[in-house]
Each structure stands twice: as C-alpha cells, then as structure tokens.
Amino acid sequence: MNGIPMEHGLLLAAVLFCIGLCGLLIRRNLLFILMSIEIMMNASALAFVVAGSRWAQADGQIMYILVISLAAAEASIGLALLLLLYRRYHTLNVDTVSEMRG
C-alpha cells in the first residue's frame, strides 16, 4: 500500500499551482513574479511525480528531472535579466519598468 493517496498529492499540486498563479497575477515586483513562476513549475513537477508513483512508472521522475532542469535554467536567466533591469532602472516594479519604454 502506498503512503499518500494520489488525490492528496494532486490536491497539494493544485493548491501550490493556484498559489503561484495568484502570486503571478497580484504581485508587481519582478522578483516575486519569478518566485511565483518557480512555485508553479514545482507544482507541475509534483503532479508528474505523484502520477508516476501511482502507476509505478519512472516516467514521472524523469519528467521531474526535466522540469527541475528547466526551472534552474529559467531561474538563472530570469535573475540575470532582473539584475540588468535593476541596474538600468533602479527598480523591480513591473509598472515602473513598462512606463520607461522609449
């Protein structure tokens, strides 16, 4: 018998995804937007692992490794762009940066 039911794992993944989506829609700071995207990616990775463990397949863990590697690449590129924006505009507010387009 498996320790955690599949429904509980998928419910946790859905809650985490909704938290990330709310953070993406509500927050105006680019750093928090990047963190919200990371939460959403980890929630989708958790759903893959839970579904893979339900049917005793390694596919979920393979997809988890793919999602984590994509999240690491996205985080490094996102943080580099964030640093560039902060050096140029001295703010991380989305509204301020979008008003400064020239």
Curated annotation (Swiss-Prot):
HAMAP family, per the entry: NDH1_NuoK
Similarity section: Belongs to the complex I subunit 4L family.
Name of the protein in its database record: NADH-quinone oxidoreductase subunit K
Membrane topology designation: Multi-pass membrane protein
Assigned keywords, A-Z: Cell inner membrane, Cell membrane, Membrane, NAD, Quinone, Translocase, Transmembrane, Transmembrane helix, Transport, Ubiquinone
Keyword Transport: yes
PANTHER family: NADH-UBIQUINONE OXIDOREDUCTASE CHAIN 4L, NADH-UBIQUINONE OXIDOREDUCTASE SUBUNIT ND4L
Transmembrane segments: 6-26, 30-50, 65-85
Provenance organism: Aeromonas hydrophila subsp. hydrophila (strain ATCC 7966 / DSM 30187 / BCRC 13018 / CCUG 14551 / JCM 1027 / KCTC 2358 / NCIMB 9240 / NCTC 8049)
InterPro entries: NADH_UbQ_OxRdtase_chain4L/K (IPR001133), NUOK/Mnh_C1-like (IPR039428)
Pfam families on file: Oxidored_q2
Localization annotation: Cell inner membrane
